[in-house]
Structure formats: C-alpha cells, structure tokens
C-alpha cells in the first residue's frame, strides 16, 4: 500500500523553526541535558543520511518543490531528527520534567506553524512529498527485529524490560508531530500517513535506542559526569 506523506508550508516556517531549535538547544545546555543534546544532533544527522542519501538520491522517492533540496532536507532532518531524539531520550531518562519538556516541544511546534501562516504570506511556498512503497517493508522488518530482541531478552532474562512503555514512546512521539502538522494544515488531511508513520517510522528505532540509552546511562549522568562504580 502506497502512503505518500506531503507537507506544504512557507519559507517563514523554516526560519521560525530554526529560532525555536536554537532556543531549545540553549535550554538543554542551561539545564545540563548534554547527552540528550548530543543524541539529538546525531539523530538529525541520521535522519539526513536517510532522507537525502536514501530517499532522495538512492530511491528518488523524496520530492521538494520551492526550495533547494539539499538545504531543505538538511533543515527538516535536523529539525525533526534533533527534536524527536531529544524528546525520546528524555523519556527514556524518566526525566522528572518530562511533562514540561513535552509541553514545550508541542507548544513550540504549534506556535511556529501558526505564526508562519499569519505572517508568512510574502514568503514562497514549499511542498515536500515522499513515496513509501519502496521501503516501508524494510522499516517494518527493522521494527520487528528490534522488538524481537527485547522480547527474547524478557523471555530469557531475569530483568523485565517494560516493552509497552517503549512502544508507547515510539508511537506517541511520531503521532504528536504528525498530529501537529495535520491540525495546522501543513500535512494534507489524510488518516493513513499519521497511522502508518506513527506505528512504524520513529517506533522502529526505539528498541535500539533503548539499549543504547541503557548502556550509556550505566556509565554517565545526563550532564556527562561519570556515575559511581557499582
């Protein structure tokens, strides 16, 4: 089944989002969430490799109209890659301020979208589309393998991993920004992209990110200081 996520926004949306991202980084530094910030940057780079390198160059399924493809996809990847990975990492941290972080991110997304619609009439329109039929099966396989690893660990091991909690993070983070795009009119009014993307796209990485998080946080605190040896 072909699901084609599409977005339409103006150039002001990009610039406002860059301001939001800079503000987000400043807050992360101020609150000493250093590892979350580093993971966010790496997540943005990963998104760019996938979106530009695979979807655009290798498969030709990514289409950008009204902007330079390289720069636009670099911004999109760093924007949603950084924000998603930071948000997920803070959830995995079981950060005591998870609600505040979540509200900050969601309110920021909504604010950027609506401000750009109010004041961006003089900026050019940008449209992005992405076909999925050539790779959603591979994504589903990656998702299956990841959760299978956690399931096998639970079956064989003494320590029980909270798989429903990990699954909820993977689905809800993607659903949240898909919903913001939908209600602000940036995403076309279709239900399948939000359903399929929420179940697969961010969620496929959660088992692996959980294992990475657990390995790192055994040795380091969020501010990069060493944890005492157990």
Question: Which stretches of residues belong to each language-model region?
Answer:
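Aromatic-rich, lipid-facing transmembrane alpha helices and their immediate juxtamembrane interface loops
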Residues: 1-230
């Amino acid at each position: 089944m072909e699901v084609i996520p599409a977005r339409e926004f103006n150039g002001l949306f990009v610039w406002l989002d860059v301001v939001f991202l800079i503000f987000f980084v400043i807050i992360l530094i101020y609150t000493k969430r250093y590892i979350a910030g580093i993971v966010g940057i790496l997540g943005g780079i990963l998104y760019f490799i996938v979106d530009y390198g695979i979807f655009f160059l290798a498969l030709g399924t990514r289409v950008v109209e009204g902007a330079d493809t390289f720069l636009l996809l670099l911004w999109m990847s760093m924007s949603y890659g950084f924000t998603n990975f930071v948000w997920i990492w803070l959830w995995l941290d079981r950060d005591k301020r998870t609600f505040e972080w979540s509200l900050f991110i969601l309110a920021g997304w909504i604010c950027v979208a609506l401000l750009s619609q109010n004041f961006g009439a003089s900026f050019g329109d940008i449209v992005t589309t992405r076909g999925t039929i050539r790779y959603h099966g591979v994504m589903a396989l990656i998702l299956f393998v990841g959760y299978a690893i956690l399931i096998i660990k639970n079956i064989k091991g003494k320590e029980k991993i909270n798989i429903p909690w990990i699954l909820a993070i993977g689905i809800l983070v993607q659903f949240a920004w898909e919903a913001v795009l939908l209600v602000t009119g940036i995403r076309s009014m279709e239900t399948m992209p939000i359903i399929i993307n929420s179940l697969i796209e961010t969620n496929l990485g959660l088992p692996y990110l959980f294992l990475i998080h657990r390995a790192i946080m055994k040795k380091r605190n969020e501010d990069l200081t060493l944890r005492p040896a157990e």
